[in-house]
């Protein structure tokens, strides 16, 4: 087999799906804007080496091994947790919406580095503690729209 079996990449964890008793399937956005799905073996164990490093909305430096249909997480190092250790409900809901948009807008075979950068920046803004009124205005500005007087 030619080439390397493993590769290192920086990813944002967008979604986690339970697999068996101790494993997770992670849906991630890599730094090239490509969607990556990988199995994190033992990530559901409380004392597992991947348990705290593969949390939702976190930026993680990962070493992945190519598998048959899914990659396998060999190593993970937490780089940034923009929402902090224990985010509140509103923050988690906002970050979840951002992650869902990123998941739907990214594909396994199409690269778009802008998707990674804008998702990472949006999660950082959500984690910075903006109140909901400012967040609504920020989203309106990003969408190039202005709120009409009727909406107020």
Could you describe each region identified by the protein language model?
Residues 98, 141-143:
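A residue-level signal for conserved active-site and pocket-lining positions in enzyme catalytic cores
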Residues 144-152:
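Single conserved hydrophobic/aromatic residue that forms the stacking wall/gate
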Residues 2-117:
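A surface-exposed, charged beta-strand/loop segment in the N-terminal or early-internal portion
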Residues 136:
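Anionic-ligand-binding alpha/beta catalytic cores of soluble enzymes and soluble regulatory domains
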């Amino acid at each position: 087999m030619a080439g390397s079996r493993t590769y290192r990449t920086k990813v944002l964890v967008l979604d986690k799906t339970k697999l068996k008793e101790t494993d997770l399937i992670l849906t991630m956005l890599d730094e090239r804007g490509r969607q990556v799905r990988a199995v994190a073996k033992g990530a559901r164990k409380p004392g597992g080496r991947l348990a705290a490093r593969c949390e939702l909305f976190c930026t993680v430096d990962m070493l992945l091994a190519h598998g048959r249909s899914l990659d396998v997480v060999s190593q993970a190092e937490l780089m940034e947790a923009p929402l902090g250790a224990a985010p509140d409900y509103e923050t988690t809901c906002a970050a979840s919406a951002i992650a869902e948009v990123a998941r739907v807008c990214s594909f396994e075979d199409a690269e778009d580095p802008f998707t990674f950068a804008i998702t990472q920046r949006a999660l950082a803004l959500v984690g910075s503690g903006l109140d909901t009124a400012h967040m609504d205005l920020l989203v309106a500005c990003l969408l190039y729209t202005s709120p009409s007087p009727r909406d107020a």
